[in-house]
């Protein structure tokens, strides 16, 4: 029940007492630095503890939009879109996470995405197959597909965004670690 209360977010167990009757949970996404909740067995529910982002909220930064799309082979995908405040993006940045077997939806506040949006770019962060946080089958679907199907998922996500949002006519791709590798491979595979 608690996990279903936060669709599109990564909910993680962060601690428990030694009897595992009281646990703390973290809820995060690229736009939410982190909220903590405690679930107490005796109460049968969770209650809010605190947020890591009160100071960040005061900056009035751009908000993320969850994007759901279907890959050409029918697999459901999810990603995050961040639009610039100007409302007229110069181009779309397809921002690829590292790993690759780690979700883009994580505990951290992604200052890079906010910086790119402040510079006038629309930023899309796809959770392509192989990303963690969407179940074992979804993560395993990316095994041995680093330079093929996973790259197609990234491109198809960017194409979906371009078809459905005013993000300009150019697409740039970048990332670190596997994100950097896949950015280079995308140029080769998709010209």
Model regions: which residues?
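Conserved phosphoryl-transfer catalytic core
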Residues: 2
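Serine-hydrolase catalytic core recognition
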Residues: 10-191
């Amino acid at each position: 029940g608690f996990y279903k209360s936060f669709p599109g977010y990564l909910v993680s167990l962060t601690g428990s007492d030694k009897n595992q009757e009281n646990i703390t949970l973290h809820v995060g996404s690229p736009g939410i630095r982190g909220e903590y909740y405690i679930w107490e067995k005796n109460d049968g529910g969770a209650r809010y503890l605190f947020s890591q982002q009160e100071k960040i909220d005061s900056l009035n930064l751009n908000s993320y939009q969850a994007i759901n799309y279907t890959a050409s082979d029918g697999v459901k995908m999810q990603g995050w879109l961040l639009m610039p405040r100007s409302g007229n993006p110069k181009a779309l940045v397809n921002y690829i996470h590292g790993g690759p077997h780690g979700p883009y939806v994580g505990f951290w506040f992604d200052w890079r995405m906010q910086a790119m949006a402040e510079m006038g770019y629309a930023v899309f962060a796809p959770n392509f197959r192989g990303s963690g946080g969407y179940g074992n089958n979804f993560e395993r679907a990316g095994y041995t597909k680093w330079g093929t199907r996973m790259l197609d998922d990234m491109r198809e996500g960017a194409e979906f965004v371009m078809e459905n949002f005013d993000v300009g006519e150019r697409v740039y791709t970048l990332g670190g670690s596997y994100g950097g590798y896949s950015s280079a491979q995308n140029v080769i595979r998709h010209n």
